[in-house]
A protein has these predicted regions:
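Transmembrane beta-barrel domains of Gram-negative outer membranes and organellar outer membranes
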Residues: 2-175, 181-260
């Protein structure tokens, strides 16, 4: 009897809720719900990510490829005029806070394994990602421009069920007139431990360049838990804690995926 074929597709969804002032002095709250369709190959994978998102704030924070970044923008101000008696009027200008929701930027990304790892050699993969501007930039859901990312991922199995991770990359940010957005580098370093054969706990330090000069680079700690319930079904959760003004104060993620 022939052995069952390896899965070639993976479909998953997750929910991330984050909040912080990102160095702007005004709190922004974001809910990000992406659906991911992934085609699996022996030497890598290709994924399509279609997200829904909701942002409450003053438009000072924009998602770039699913990651919140301080972009320095503000929502339109509102001017009101009130009577004060004796023919006098007082005009007040107030900053408008809004809640906007809708389809976010679509992401197409690929991974190609160039080196198969062992106990002495890390697994090495090259990654590429394109952000397609499907989000409504007029409502603060995106920049309205394409972004392109290139990077590498390293994974090293260690003795006693430990695993080390290191990722780094560079994003070409699409030009937005008058916004002064800079291209962005990023990296993260992580250490994981298999609590059981099917449960991996890990912690990461992450940093990426602020896209607007004058803001602090976002830096955070990410604690993640991944459970391979069956060969087909997987669950994940994560907690994020900001270490700099450019990062959210906190973030929490829940997700699941199915392979077939």
């Amino acid at each position: 009897m022939a052995a069952p074929a390896d899965p070639t597709w993976q479909v998953g969804g997750s929910l991330t809720h984050s909040s912080g002032d990102y160095g702007t002095g005004s709190t922004t709250t974001i809910t990000y719900i992406p659906i991911t369709i992934r085609r699996l190959f022996d030497s890598g994978d290709i994924s399509l990510v279609i997200p829904y998102l909701s942002i409450t704030g003053d438009c000072g924070v924009t998602l770039l490829s699913g990651t919140p970044n301080s972009t320095g923008g503000t929502c339109p101000t509102r001017t009101t005029t009130t009577g004060r008696g004796k023919g006098k009027e007082v005009t007040r200008t107030r900053q408008t806070r809004t809640t906007e929701g809708g389809i976010g930027d679509t992401i197409l990304r690929g991974r190609y394994y160039v080196l198969e790892g062992s106990t002495t050699v890390p697994t090495v993969a090259f990654i590429a990602r394109v952000k397609v501007p499907t989000a409504d930039s007029a409502r603060g859901l995106g920049t309205g421009r394409f972004d392109e990312t290139f990077g590498t991922e390293l994974t090293q199995r260690l003795p006693s069920d430990f695993v080390a991770f290191a990722d780094a990359g560079y994003t070409l940010i699409g030009h937005v007139p008058g916004a002064g957005l800079r291209n962005q580098w990023y990296y993260d370093l992580g250490l994981g431990y298999y609590l059981t054969k099917t449960v991996l706990g890990s912690v990461y330090y992450e940093e990426w360049r602020a896209v607007v000069q004058g803001f602090q680079n976002p830096q955070d700690l990410l604690f993640a838990l991944n459970w391979t319930a069956t060969d087909a079904l997987r669950f994940n959760t994560a907690l994020q804690f900001g270490l700099s003004d450019g990062a959210p104060d906190y973030g929490i993620t829940f997700g699941a995926s199915l392979r077939f």
